[in-house]
Amino acid sequence: MEKPLVSKKYLFTFILITSLFALWGFANDITNPMVAAFQTVMELSAAKASLIQFAFYGGYATMAIPAALFIRRYSYKSGILLGLALYAIGAFLFIPAAEWQEFSFFCVSLYILTFGLAFLETTANPFILSLGDKETSTRRLNLAQAFNPVGSLSGMAVASFIVLPQLLSDQRDAAGKIIFPLLSETEKASIRLHDLAVIRNPYVAIGLVVVAVLVIIALTKMPKTESEEKKAAGETHTVKETLSNLWHNSIYREGVFAQVCYVAAQIMVWTFIIQYADNLGINKATAQMFNIVAMSLNLSGRFIGTFVMRYVNTRRLLMLFGIGASVCTLGAICIEGMLGLYSLVAISLFMSIMFPSIYGIALENVDSKDTHLGAAFLVMAIVGGALMPPLQGMMIDQETIWGMPAVNMSFILPLVCFLVIIVYGYRSFMQLKSIK
């Protein structure tokens, strides 16, 4: 008899924790198109505008380990509540940031907001893994992660239909060129005030939603996980023992590196779709529609992938999806025009299962007493999203590389990342075969 993904006694908790995946998906994907928006309205280079992503994903790198130590000391529920509080504070800081019109203030606001996301991801991912049988843990996480693109699509929809169409700085002439740089300083100041207020509003709204979720979770009793029960019984590892165990687990160790590469690839692909489309003369609001299609493919891939995992080993499927992503990335690099853009969008289908699969594979054979810190390093791997986009932005600023549009050639960076994921899927699958 097939074991259920989630038993009835954990179902309400599973639903509640799964809602958090949508919350951080919203924050991720309303922020991606803001890179291009800030680049125009604040008159920044692509490299400097991508500091939005550096601040956003740098927050994960800064707070993942402190979050794990906090959860280790207290509980998963405490970590969730603190994460939601930090999320709300960062969102509400957009109010003074828009008033002062300081790009650095927006970066700080996002940095604090992602302190909260680091707590939520460090907590929610291993919590979902623990809510049922170990054999179904990776499939269970893939199912929960399928609701992350729901939040992402919501964020993209808000950006596409509410934020980007209202940006006066994106108005263009008959030739499709942005006219904002040609305006007087007085006109620019007026438009900047308007546009930053438009950018601010969805963050304030999501901050209010986060506060409501915080109250609901605060009033809900959560089940104790295996690691929390062992802690209560005095069965714990020291931090040094945990670090040693993790380091000597090759699949875990390589999984952290694969996750760094995956997040870097994901953020580069989704952030610079707009610049790729802009290079084809497409305005930001229309370009964002391609991001929505990409995320819809990603959402579909999560559900399809979760179903296929009943018949195909997760490790093998990860390798196959890595190959598919690499082929599409080559299309985005080598093919100019709309066909190249379609190839770029199609990458998202193959990225769909990567994050939860790498996460689940890496933690599958980690002792439950080590999962807090193990999860933290996998969340900390999101730093890949901070490090690589500025490098891609610098490539895009070159305009042409080897006679090709620089925006096309910049996708060599995510291609390298996908090759790493193919190798990880293959190596983890071969190790599983050797054990059997």
Task: Indicate where each model-derived feature is located.
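Multi-pass alpha-helical transporter architecture, strongest
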Residues: E2-K3, S7, L214-K221, L415-K436
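Extracytoplasmic gate region of multi-pass secondary transporters
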Residues: T31-V35, G155-Q166, S244-I292
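Glycine-rich segments within core transmembrane alpha-helices of 12-TM secondary carriers
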Residues: T136-L168, A376-P389
